[in-house]
């Protein structure tokens, strides 16, 4: 990959400033600079990590075939253009090698591309063969990927259903909290009304005692004249009765212990 960067810069330099000694010197200085600074090795390491560790995107068989065909056409086109500029097969092959040191002071040839590594293996090992994909492995892997894709779709659907369930439960929780708040408010209001009712009944009993009236509190409240008053002549002995209240209104135990209210 670093060599491709150098080649691209060399091509741009020659096309811009001409194919002369100055352009060649500039390209050599650039290559020496990135080697000395470590940028060359960093680019190679990134390239190796990309091709070894990256996860390929999901593609159909036809898409892979089309991309391979396009890649082959581009490579052939680049080779043809290189041949017209004097960059023959020999030049391309030798450019993929570099001189290095084995650590013992011996000069060795170092391949810089995967293809050059294969060429070097073929040079001294006539029995060298590239490992092939085991029979049926590709089909098996494709089936496993399809199965995993189905499982993934099922899990996505279940996750979506769980999210909807959680959302509904959150809504139920909010409604329950609101209902609980309303219930507490109603309890407080009911207790306040009960206290006011009891106080009103107490006051009524006190007033009845003060004015000599009888007050009967059961399911309703009845106020009548006292039996101690004398009968009026010429009239029937009738007791004026005033009833009010609603069923269920019972006076508390405090009323039974009341004395006359002054």
From Swiss-Prot:
Gene Ontology cellular-component annotations: host cell cytoplasm
Disulfide bonds: none
Keywords: Coiled coil, Host cytoplasm, RNA-binding, Translation regulation
InterPro entries the UniProt entry points to: Rotavirus_NSP3
GO biological process, one term: regulation of translation
Coiled-coil segments on the chain, per record: 138-179
Region named Disordered: 226-249
Role of this protein: May play a role in stimulating the translation of viral mRNAs.
Homology family: Belongs to the rotavirus NSP3 family.
Protein name (Swiss-Prot/TrEMBL): Non-structural protein 3
Native organism: Rotavirus X (isolate RVX/Human/Bangladesh/NADRV-B219/2002/GXP[X]) (RV ADRV-N)
Taxonomic classification: Viruses, Riboviria, Orthornavirae, Duplornaviricota, Resentoviricetes
């Amino acid at each position: 990959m670093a060599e491709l960067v150098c080649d691209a810069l060399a091509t741009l330099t020659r096309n811009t400033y001409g194919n002369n000694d100055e352009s060649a010197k500039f390209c050599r200085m650039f290559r020496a600079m990135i080697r000395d600074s470590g940028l060359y090795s960093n680019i190679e390491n990134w390239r190796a990590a990309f091709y070894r560790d990256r996860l390929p995107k999901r593609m159909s068989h036809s898409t892979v075939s089309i991309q391979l065909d396009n890649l082959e056409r581009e490579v052939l086109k680049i080779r043809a253009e290189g041949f017209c500029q004097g960059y023959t097969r020999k030049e391309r092959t030798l450019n993929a090698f570099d001189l290095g040191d084995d650590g013992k002071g011996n000069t060795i040839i170092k391949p810089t591309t995967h293809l050059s590594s294969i060429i070097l293996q073929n040079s001294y090992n006539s029995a060298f063969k590239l490992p092939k994909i085991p029979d049926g492995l590709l089909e098996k892997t494709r089936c496993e990927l399809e199965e995993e894709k189905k499982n993934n779709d099922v899990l996505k659907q279940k996750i979506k259903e769980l999210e909807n369930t959680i959302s509904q439960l959150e809504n139920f929780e909010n409604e329950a909290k609101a209902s609980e708040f309303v219930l507490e408010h109603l309890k407080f209001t009911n207790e306040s009304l009960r206290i006011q009712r009891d106080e009103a009944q107490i006051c009524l009993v006190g007033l009845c005692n003060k004015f000599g009236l009888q007050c009967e509190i059961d399911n309703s409240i009845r106020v009548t004249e006292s039996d101690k008053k004398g009968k009026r002549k010429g009239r029937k002995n009738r007791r004026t009765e005033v009833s009010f209240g609603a069923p269920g209104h019972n006076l508390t135990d405090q009323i039974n212990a009341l004395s006359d209210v002054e």
